[in-house]
Amino acid sequence: TYSGKLMIVKDPSRLFVGTVPEFTNGNGMVVADIAKRYDAIGGVNGGEFVDGETTYTAMPIGLVMKDGEILNDNGGTSHVTGITFDNKLVLGNMNATKAKELNIRDCVSISNHIGPFLIVNGEAQDIVGIAGGTNPRTAIGQTADGKILLLAVDGRQPNSIGATFSDL
């Protein structure tokens, strides 16, 4: 079994990337503390960070943009989740130049162990045979009328072991 929370952001212009005060190899922050830093009512984990000795650091691995400004760039291509200046969700493999061309306002990225796209242009995708097992999950989507859907599923807990991609 699993449990999670779904946040519906009716105004996509309110969606933004929140970050630690400084990207360092020191310890990172938990989502709740980053949300407090921005007076946000909610948030989900995003991006990928350098793995420290005992915890993840506050140093992102790939592209991070906020308000159109590049805050971090590894110089390569990575899987990006972003929102454009006209509030459209963008998911794809790209570098900073492509993100700028697509008019991305805010984005985070992760390396290629991203999960599959579950729905594309309203059509459910075939995810049979995609590995990943039962784990904590975060998913993002956008409805046809522009609302942003943020789903966080708890995992590795007695009351919520996590979800598979098919569960999502």
Task: Locate each region found by the language model.
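Zymogen propeptides
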Residues: 1-75, 79-80, 88-91
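A substrate-binding/cap region within the structured catalytic cores of diverse enzymes
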Residues: 74-127
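Domain-core and long-helix interface of multi-subunit machines
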Residues: 111-115, 119-168
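A short, polar/proline- and glycine-enriched secondary-structure boundary/capping micro-motif
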Residues: 27-29, 100-106, 159-166
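Solvent-exposed coil/turn segments that connect beta secondary-structure elements
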Residues: 12, 48-49, 86, 96, ...
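Short, solvent-exposed aromatic-acidic interface loops
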Residues: 21-27, 94-100, 153-157
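Extracellular/periplasmic catalytic domains that process cell-envelope and extracellular macromolecules
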Residues: 35-37, 74-75, 84, 131-134, ...
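Short acidic/polar alpha-helix capping motifs at helix-coil junctions
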Residues: 12, 102, 133-136
